[in-house]
Amino acid sequence: MDNTIIITEEATIDNYVSEYDIAVCGYGGAGGSAAIEAANNNSQVILFERASDGGGSTALSSCEMYLGGSGGTSLQNACGFEDSSENMIAYIEASLEGKGDQKKIKLYCENAASHFEWVKSLGVNYKESAHLGRIVVPESNESLLFTGNERVSPFSECAKPIPRGHVPSHEGDFGGKIFFDALKKAISKTKNISVSFDSRVLGLVVDQQNVIVGVSFKKDNIVQHVKVKKGVILTAGGFVMNEEMINKYLSFQTSFGAPYGNAWDKGDGIQIGLAMNANVINMDEAFFGVYFYPPESLTYGIFVNSDGNRFVNEDSYGARIDTIALNKKIKKFIWLFKMRTLSHQFILINFRFWLLQKPSRSSKLRQDLKRVRYHQQ
């Protein structure tokens, strides 16, 4: 599939099909939210979506929004938690290990609580109840949970552990659909927003001073252009489904796992920015997750590498375990635990789960376990 991005000089265009104040490229959670806010601030908005409907990765997600600060969100407060912006900033900066933009982190943390009220104003329902166990997504309808390493050393020494995961109240794992359905409904009721589906943004239109004045897109196999007076917002998602970009930026990680996400995560927005000589950061970062919990009791096993050495604290968030393994170039690790409530033993080898009814009969496993130096916990 051709993903070539083009920058078109305005002088070469015969005509624009329409004119707007703002063009938003990508109709997921970010794009839909940006379109509403722009329209509510007296802008005429065109919202482009490459697929036949909106949603993107947002609609596929659990929609666990990371929110807090400013004394805490209304949900945090209802569950008995107070959260300062300074505390939230300290945790996020520690998690990013110096790779974050401090101004953006501060801006986000100081406004996150108001973001939550905005989401609720769309009609998204949250139950004023917290699940404080170690889970990935709630199995019941609680809406507040821990979704990171807040209770894990060394982060717990940097900031007071506070649950900040806000998920729409439901039983299951489709919070993203709940949020996006509410967002989509709000967009349908918002004046000044036009939506164009099956429209692939090809690039931007610039004038003689290289100022962005429009957007080029293809719809019904016809290349068209719209003029924009205020600006273009790029919300086209990541590049997990673009093999060329994966090989360019994440080649050292391609052997670990398989791409997971929205089929249209082709990196179009990033490529448009690059074509305009914009700066990009952290392109070699990706989300890898090893989720061996729940149940929470599995935390009390140990992870060891092929030399039998423990390399991570097991109460870490699943993505941190995998990231540390990748950074330390650990291509194989073993997970050992004792749990009386299970009649089987689970061993994690080469990032895969193996269910072994009688592990003593596995010669391969016996060889692996002989190399393990047992650590008492």
Located regions from the model:
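Conserved redox-cofactor binding core of oxidoreductases
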Residues: 107-223, 243-244, 293
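Glycine-rich loop(s) and the adjacent beta-strand/alpha-helix scaffold that form part
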Residues: 174, 220-222, 227-291
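Extreme N-terminal leader/targeting segments of oxidoreductases
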Residues: 1-22, 40-42
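An anion/pyrophosphate-binding glycine-rich loop and adjacent beta-alpha core
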Residues: 270, 279-377
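Glycine-rich active-site loop/strand segments that organize a redox cofactor
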Residues: 66-108
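A short alpha-helix-loop-beta-strand transition element characteristic
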Residues: 99-104, 123-134, 279-283, 312
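N-terminal Rossmann-like FAD-binding beta1-loop-alpha1 element of flavoenzymes
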Residues: 20-47
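Glycine-rich FAD pyrophosphate-binding loop
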Residues: 40-61
